[in-house]
């Protein structure tokens, strides 16, 4: 899936780097998949707002992901109207950092880190939820990557 008239070179680089990353024994296939999916969303201009609270603009204590609102909330706004703890869920500071890193990093440096099991679980949840709420098409290259992950 790409927007019409969009330069697809970065997406092709992402696919290439992702396929190369699948050969690296120290990188889990699950992590490669989630990085690929989330970066693809970002390259298509559809990434959630992750660098400041979507309610107040605060840039610290960003611990609550709100898939419906396509962004992250600080601790204070999570507990206030209109959110009151609804629709958002807690993620660790490490997960927030990883999501920001995926969005902001150049494609060639995406696969230079690993994550803990806890961060991987949160990353799975965030990416799956975001896809369900905001992405209405199936990525053909994501399907190809899925097929490769089965082996």
Regions found by a protein language model. Give the residues of each.
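Non-catalytic alpha-helical scaffolds and adjoining flexible linkers that form interface surfaces
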Residues: 1-151
């Amino acid at each position: 899936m790409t927007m019409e008239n969009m330069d697809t070179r970065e997406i092709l680089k992402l696919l290439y780097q992702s396929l190369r990353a699948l050969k690296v024994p120290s990188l889990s296939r699950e992590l490669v998949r989630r990085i690929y999916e989330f970066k693809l969303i970002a390259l298509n201009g559809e990434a959630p707002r992750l660098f400041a609270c979507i309610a107040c603009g605060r840039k610290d204590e960003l611990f609550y992901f709100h898939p419906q609102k396509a962004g992250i909330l600080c601790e204070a706004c999570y507990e206030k109207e209109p959110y009151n703890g609804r629709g958002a869920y807690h993620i660790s500071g490490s997960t927030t950092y990883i999501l920001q890193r995926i969005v902001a990093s150049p494609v060639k440096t995406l696969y230079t880190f690993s994550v803990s099991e806890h961060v991987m679980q949160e990353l799975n949840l965030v990416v799956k939820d975001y896809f369900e709420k905001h992405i209405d098409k199936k990525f053909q290259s994501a399907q190809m990557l899925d097929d490769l992950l089965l082996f």
